[in-house]
Amino acid sequence: MAKQKFERTKPHVNVGTIGHVDHGKTTLTAAITKVLALQGAAQFVSYDQIDNAPEERARGITIAIRHVEYQTARRHYAHVDCPGHADYIKNMITGAAQMDGAILVVSAPDGPMPQTREHVLLARQVQVPAMVVFLNKVDMMDDEELLELVELELRELLSNHGFPGDEVPIVRGSALAALSSTSTDINAPEYKCILDLMNAVDEYIPTPVREIDKPFLMPIEDVFGIKGRGTVVTGRIERGKVKMGDTVEIIGMTHEAPRRTVVTGVEMFQKTLDEGIAGDNVGVLLRGIERTEVERGQVLAAPGSIKPHAKFKANVYVLKKEEGGRHTPFFSGYRPQFYIRTTDVTGAIHLPEGVEMVMPGDNIEMTVELIVPVAIEEGLRFAIREGGRTVGAGVVSAIVD
């Protein structure tokens, strides 16, 4: 069967359901595909198909994750749902499936629960830009005042974690009523909450800035000296674009200030390129730079767009021994390797006050101090390695130095 062509007619946005176990994330995901399928804008994916999610590997970690896709009149969406709580944490930290926005699912009879808080905190730390709330199972509550109290509590929780709690749309409904309805009429009352939710997601979650429109950044993977022409660095452009004549900085892996140089050529597959853009694997020719003055692990970037740092806070998931991780806990002062972009850098871990040790399977915020500064920013993801195997995954939550 011929593959369908992906038509890029609408802006593409990545979303996902988050929230406490059994509050209805998977039921809601299935209900969205069901209701939008009535408009021909999705393929229905059942609860069981989502619940039995396939496993994927990201940064050496196995995660059960289900991707569904659907469209509204305005956008094309990729939506992720994870069956288990640990899978959520691993997904958010590894960025296996990036989220441009999240749908926080909260059961009205229960209100916000521990995992509700944990997912909101993580969403903040991994820089999920916006959130919409689906207040589920409202058909089990007949007291309007209680519903309003739950909404107030949710807005307060969001505000406490750095989201604009007063502005976040809260849509009430019942995902199960929508999913189990036999009606084929899109205007059936039980489908209204799903359409209202998608409208809120369309309106409130911003269309992400395309990577190509951000300042140029390319992690350096390899360095070659070319006789008579100078030094070429190769890598995959992470964001932005680059062309001959651009001024760039070489950042990280040294205690000296970043060096500026001028791009004298861009090549791809041995051919000259007018302009390299995000996603391209390119070679960049640099003026006046010796082969020995640049190395793997540094980045090439638009001047002033990213700075080298050695000390930062990070949210980390520590692999269990069944996942190939450590068998024993570690303590403050532990010195593993941090695999950042294209290379390993040694660093020391400082645990928060009152935390004695970290067990395999834990999710924790810690401070990391690298032996040499590298180009780092909030939201950057990394792996923690020991003797070449991955023992943890992390995301930078704040720069300290």
UniProtKB/Swiss-Prot annotation:
Its EC number is 3.6.5.3. CDD domains: EF_Tu, EFTU_II, EFTU_III. It holds the Pfam family GTP_EFTU_D2. Residues 60-64 are annotated as: G2. Residues 174-176 are annotated as: G5. Residues 19-26 are annotated as: G1. GO terms for cellular component: cytosol. Residues 136-139 are annotated as: G4. Transmembrane segments: none annotated. It is found in: Cytoplasm. One of its GO terms (molecular function) is translation elongation factor activity. GTP binds at residues 19-26, 81-85, 136-139. It catalyses: GTP + H2O = GDP + phosphate + H(+). Residues 10-209 form the tr-type G domain. Keywords: Cytoplasm, Elongation factor, GTP-binding, Hydrolase, Magnesium, Metal-binding, Nucleotide-binding, Protein biosynthesis. Belongs to the TRAFAC class translation factor GTPase superfamily. Classic translation factor GTPase family. EF-Tu/EF-1A subfamily. HAMAP family: EF_Tu_B. This is Elongation factor Tu 1. It comes from Roseiflexus sp. (strain RS-1). The gene is tuf1.
